[in-house]
């Protein structure tokens, strides 16, 4: 029995929440114990760009990218749980990072 931590990131929170819901459903179907989804603070990266190619520094445009994150901890992961997670078809926009947290 092993602890697994899933960290999911996406630019669109709706796509992220759908992926989290499908992961939680798959884990609960196998009977594993889980904690989460835990929402992490949204990271906002802002960029300021001068509009014109030459002078006129007063004319600027601002852009931002928001990265939404969630953590799911699977406390008691069985081989069946890992197999069901591998078979899941998640959205391509969602970045999934899997870490093994050790043995119990």
Swiss-Prot record:
Entry annotated with the keyword Ribosomal protein: yes
The protein's UniProt keywords, in alphabetical order, are: Ribonucleoprotein, Ribosomal protein
Q: Which GO terms describe its molecular function?
A: structural constituent of ribosome; tRNA binding
The protein's matches in PROSITE patterns, at most eight in alphabetical order, are given as: RIBOSOMAL_S10
Task: Read off the Gene3D superfamilies from this record.
Answer: Ribosomal protein S10 domain
Matching Pfam families, A to Z?
A: Ribosomal_S10
Q: What InterPro entries does the annotation carry?
A: Ribosomal_uS10 (IPR001848), Ribosomal_uS10_CS (IPR018268), Ribosomal_uS10_dom (IPR027486), Ribosomal_uS10_dom_sf (IPR036838)
Q: Name one GO cellular component term.
A: ribonucleoprotein complex
GO annotation terms (biological process): translation
Known partners and oligomeric status: Part of the 30S ribosomal subunit.
The family note in this entry says: Belongs to the universal ribosomal protein uS10 family.
- Functional note: Involved in the binding of tRNA to the ribosomes.
Protein's name in the database: Small ribosomal subunit protein uS10
Instruction: Give the organism, scientific name.
Output: Aliarcobacter butzleri (strain RM4018) (Arcobacter butzleri)
Gene responsible for this protein: rpsJ
């Amino acid at each position: 029995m092993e602890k697994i931590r899933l960290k999911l990131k996406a630019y669109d929170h709706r796509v992220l929440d759908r992926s989290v819901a499908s992961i939680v459903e798959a884990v609960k179907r196998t009977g594993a114990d889980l904690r989460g989804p835990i929402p992490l603070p949204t990271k906002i990266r802002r960029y300021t760009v001068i509009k014109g190619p030459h002078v006129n520094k007063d004319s600027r445009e601002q852009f931002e990218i928001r990265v939404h994150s969630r953590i799911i901890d699977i406390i008691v992961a069985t081989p069946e749980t890992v197999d069901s997670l591998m078979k899941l078809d998640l959205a391509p926009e969602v970045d999934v990072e899997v870490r093994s947290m050790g043995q119990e």
